[in-house]
C-alpha cells in the first residue's frame, strides 16, 4: 500500500506526493531461500582388522552445506593371542576430521558455477583414480575406505584419498624430519600416491628432539671491514709462484706475491717486495709469522648485538614451536586460529582408551615346554566416547581414523647422569636459559666407542632433570642371550638410530609378543551412533517438482 506524504511546500500548493523510498524496488536483493531440514538416523557398524602404528580409516562420508552431524563412536578392540601377559600399555586412539572439498580439488567451486570471467567454463567432472593391475589389495587404504578389493580398472573419486594425505601432512607428520606425502588439487591423479601411512611417535625426550639447535642458520655477530694480513718476518718468494701454491690453507684468490728482501719489516703491502732471486722458496716458509690486523675492522654496535640475540631467539622458538602457520600464530603470538580459517583439515574430536590384558593360565600340562599353569593372555579394549557434534557450511568430507600405539620405553641407552664429569655438566641456575643442549648417542644407544659422544639431536637445556625414563633390566632386556622380551613392548634397535623419518614413525614391536605374526594384530568392531540433520525432505515424492 502506498503511503501519501505531503511536505510543507506541498501543503502550500495543495499537492501531495508518493515517497520515493517506497517506490524503489530492491534489485540488489534476491528472495531468501528457506530450505527445510530433516533428521536422519544414519547409525551403522564396522568390522575390520588392522595393524598397530598405522592411521586406519574407519569412516568416510560426504558432507553437505547445512548438515549438522551428531556422532558417537563405540569401539570394541580385540588383540591377537599373546604369548605372555604383557606388562605394557597399548592405547586405541580415534580422530575425526572435516576436510572441505575446495581444499582437495581446485576446480570444485568452478564446477558449482563460480567464474572469474563471464565466459569461463564450468564444465568439470570430479577427479578420479583407477585401481591398479590386480585391484586394490586387502588392508590397503582403498580397502579401509570400503572400496571392493581385487578388481582391476575400478574407477573411484579421488578426494577421500587426497583428504587422507592432507590430514597426514597437517596433523601427523613431523615437519622437522619428514617430507610431506604426495598431494595434488589437480583434475588428474595417480593411485600410486596413496598408501596406508604410519603416524609419528608421541613426543618424549628423544622423539621431540630437534635435528639442530635452531631452525635457521647460526646467527653471527656482524663484524665489518677487511683485516689486512701482515708479516713479522722476511722470506724470499719467486714471483711466478702464487700464494695458494705455498699456503694451501689460504682459500682466497690473489695475485702472485713476493716477500721483502730487506732487513725492514716490510709486510705484504710494502713496495720493497723482492721480484727476483732464488728459484725455490726456503723450506722454513710457514704461516706462523702471519697475523691479521683487526684495528681496521668495524666494531659491532649495541643495537646490532641486540638484534643478533633476538634473531637467534626467533630461530630457537621456530624450532620448538613449529613453522606451520597455525604453529607460528600459537608460538609467537599466543593466538589459536580455527582450522577452517587457516584452510586446513578441521579436527572435530576423538578419544583414547586402553587395551586391557587378561591372563590365561594353562590348566593341564602337554609337555615339558608347556607345563601346567603356563601363562598366555588375551587383550581387549572397549570405549564409548570420542564423538562430536558439528554444523557444516560447505561441501566436504568427514574422515574418521583409528590408531593403536604403545608406551615408548628405551633399554639400550645410558642415562645422562652417569656421564657427568665436570661441574658444568651439572645443573646450575645460572645456565638454565642457555640454548638447546645435545642429546648424546649413548643416551639412546650406548656402544662404548667414539660415536657415543656425538649428537643424536638437541633438547631443551637440562631436560634430563625434568623427567625420569622408564627402565628395562634383567632378562627382560632384549639384548639378553635368552630374553623374556615377549613380556613388554620396549624399543629395540639393531644399530645406532638417527633422528630421521624412519625413527619418528610409530612402529610398536607387537610382532614380538603375539603368537601369530603374519596375520593382522587387531580386530575391531565399531558402532557409530550417527544422527544427521540435512537440508533434505524426509521422503522424495514423485510429482512434487515445484515444492521443497
What is each of the regions a protein language model found here?
Residues 1-548:
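Intrinsically disordered, low-complexity segments
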Amino acid at each position: 500500500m502506498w503511503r501519501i506524504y505531503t511536505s510543507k511546500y506541498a501543503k502550500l500548493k495543495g499537492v501531495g506526493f508518493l515517497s520515493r523510498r517506497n517506490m524503489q524496488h530492491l534489485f540488489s536483493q534476491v528472495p531468501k531461500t528457506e530450505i527445510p531440514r530433516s533428521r536422519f538416523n544414519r547409525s551403522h557398524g564396522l568390522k575390520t582388522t588392522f595393524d598397530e602404528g598405522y592411521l586406519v580409516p574407519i569412516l568416510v562420508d560426504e558432507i553437505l552445506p547445512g548438515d549438522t552431524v551428531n556422532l558417537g563412536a563405540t569401539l570394541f578392540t580385540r588383540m591377537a593371542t599373546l604369548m605372555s601377559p604383557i606388562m605394557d600399555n597399548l592405547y586405541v586412539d580415534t580422530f575425526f576430521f572435516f576436510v572441505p572439498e575446495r581444499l582437495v580439488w581446485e576446480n570444485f567451486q568452478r564446477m558449482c558455477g563460480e567464474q572469474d570471467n563471464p565466459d569461463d567454463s564450468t564444465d568439470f567432472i570430479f577427479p578420479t583414480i583407477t585401481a591398479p593391475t590386480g585391484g586394490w589389495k586387502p588392508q590397503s587404504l582403498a580397502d579401509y575406505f570400503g572400496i571392493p578389493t581385487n578388481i582391476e580398472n575400478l574407477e573411484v573419486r579421488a578426494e577421500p584419498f587426497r583428504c587422507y594425505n592432507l590430514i597426514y601432512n597437517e596433523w601427523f607428520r613431523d615437519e622437522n624430519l619428514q617430507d610431506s606425502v604426495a598431494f595434488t588439487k589437480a583434475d588428474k591423479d595417480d593411485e600410486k600416491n596413496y598408501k596406508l601411512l604410519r603416524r609419528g611417535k608421541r613426543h618424549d625426550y628423544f622423539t621431540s628432539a630437534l635435528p639442530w639447535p635452531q631452525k635457521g642458520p647460526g646467527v653471527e655477530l656482524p663484524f665489518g671491514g677487511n683485516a689486512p694480513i701482515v708479516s713479522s718476518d722476511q722470506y724470499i718468494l719467486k714471483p711466478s709462484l702464487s700464494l695458494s701454491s705455498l699456503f694451501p690453507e689460504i682459500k682466497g684468490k690473489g695475485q702472485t706475491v713476493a716477500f721483502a728482501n730487506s732487513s725492514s719489516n716490510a709486510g705484504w703491502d710494502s713496495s720493497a717486495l723482492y721480484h727476483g732471486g732464488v728459484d725455490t722458496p726456503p723450506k722454513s716458509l710457514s704461516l706462523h709469522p702471519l697475523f691479521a690486523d683487526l684495528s681496521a675492522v668495524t666494531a659491532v654496535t649495541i643495537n646490532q648485538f641486540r638484534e643478533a640475540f633476538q634473531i637467534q631467539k626467533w630461530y630457537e622458538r621456530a624450532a620448538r614451536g613449529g613453522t606451520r602457520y597455525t604453529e607460528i600464530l600459537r608460538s609467537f603470538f599466543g593466538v589459536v586460529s580455527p582450522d577452517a580459517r587457516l584452510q586446513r583439515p578441521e579436527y572435530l574430536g576423538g578419544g583414547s582408551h586402553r587395551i586391557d590384558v587378561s591372563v590365561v593360565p594353562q590348566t593341564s600340562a602337554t609337555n615339558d615346554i608347556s607345563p601346567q599353569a603356563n601363562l598366555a593372555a588375551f587383550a581387549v579394549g572397549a570405549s564409548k566416547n570420542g564423538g562430536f557434534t558439528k554444523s557444516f557450511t560447505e561441501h566436504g568430507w568427514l574422515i574418521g581414523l583409528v590408531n593403536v600405539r604403545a608406551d615408548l620405553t628405551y633399554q639400550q641407552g645410558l642415562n645422562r647422569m652417569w656421564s657427568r664429569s665436570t661441574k658444568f655438566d651439572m645443573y646450575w641456575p645460572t645456565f638454565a636459559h642457555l640454548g638447546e643442549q645435545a642429546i648424546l648417542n649413548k643416551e639412546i644407544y650406548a656402544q662404548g666407542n667414539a660415536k657415543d659422544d656425538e649428537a643424536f639431536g638437541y633438547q631443551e637445556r637440562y631436560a634430563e632433570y625434568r623427567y625420569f625414563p622408564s627402565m628395562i633390566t634383567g632378562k627382560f632386556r632384549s639384548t639378553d642371550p635368552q630374553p623374556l622380551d615377549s613380556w613388554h613392548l620396549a624399543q629395540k634397535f639393531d644399530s645406532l638410530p638417527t633422528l630421521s623419518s624412519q625413527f619418528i614413525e610409530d612402529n610398536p614391536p607387537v610382532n614380538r609378543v603375539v603368537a601369530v605374526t603374519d596375520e593382522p594384530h587387531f580386530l575391531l568392531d565399531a558402532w557409530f551412533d550417527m544422527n544427521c540433520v540435512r537440508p533434505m525432505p524426509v521422503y522424495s515424492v514423485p510429482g512434487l517438482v515445484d515444492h521443497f
